[in-house]
Amino acid sequence: MKTIRFCGHKNIIHTRLIQAREAHLLSQQQLAAKLQLLEVSIDQQAISKIELDKRIVTDYELMCLCKVLHVKAAWLMGDLD
């Protein structure tokens, strides 16, 4: 299986995901629980892997992360300050 990478990374949101999660005072487990309420099947280990840049993020996961964390996708992807 081919590993997908962009500039050596599996995802481009890992740094800002941590910032947004911590700004909302959420643990990885709490974030996973909020995502599961939106029917996104993601657990604490998956959140950890995303934050450690060891897992890709699907488009629907990105949109749900934005919804739960109240941020724009462009910000999460590093386009906006």
Predicted regions and their residues:
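Short basic helix-loop element that most often maps to the first helix and adjoining turn
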Residues: 15-37
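Residue-level signal for the short linker/turn that defines the boundary of a DNA-recognition helix
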Residues: 12-15, 25-26, 42, 57-60
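DNA major-groove recognition helix of helix-turn-helix/homeodomain DNA-binding modules
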Residues: 54-75
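Conserved hydrophobic/aromatic packing and binding residues within compact polymer-binding modules
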Residues: 17, 31-32, 47-50, 76
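Recognition helix of helix-turn-helix/homeodomain-like DNA-binding domains
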Residues: 37-57
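Short amphipathic recognition helices of helix-turn-helix/homeodomain-type DNA-binding modules
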Residues: 75-81
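A detector for short, charged/polar N-terminal pre-domain segments
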Residues: 1-13
